[in-house]
């Protein structure tokens, strides 16, 4: 349903004032390499996300600062009140502050229920993260993402049954997919 629920956080952001929030990390949160997740990692990840080269920077213009209050608490100060704080912060992919960009591209480390097992130019494979202690553990033994950039290749894979989920469905293909038994959903983006 595309609703946002806490994953790495212990709960929703706590409103301190109209322009200040605090987020507490989940007890015992670890990265997929087994190291502890700290508030400094979240701050560093926010800084990566809002770097001038990042496509996600545009989604955080309402933020004044993000700081580590202590090892488990992040303080977010806003330039003005903003109702969709938690929905925007899902764009911050939390990674170890100590990792450089090349290491993250070669073997990404995260905090979710899955960890990367294999990455190629056309496919990504993920398996359950044994260090994950959140509310939504991995349910499938393996997840695979294929990079099918061509609309006709994605459509053929969907109708042929070699994929279970498809993003960016061409409007002209919706009826064909529905006719093949697919459930086609349309969800608004940030600008809608």
Predicted regions and their residues:
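Surface-exposed binding/hinge segments that line
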Residues: 20-24, 58-98
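Ligand-site clamp/hinge motif
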Residues: 102, 131-176
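Gly/Pro-rich hinge or "lid" segments in bacterial periplasmic/extracellular proteins
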Residues: 3, 89-138, 142
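Local pocket/hinge segments that shape ligand/substrate recognition
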Residues: 59, 167-192
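Sec-exported extracytoplasmic/periplasmic mature domains
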Residues: 27-30, 47-54, 94, 150, ...
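Solvent-exposed coil/turn segments that connect beta secondary-structure elements
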Residues: 17-19, 26-28, 42, 47, ...
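N-terminal lobe/hinge region of extracytoplasmic solute-binding protein
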Residues: 1-16, 25, 47, 109
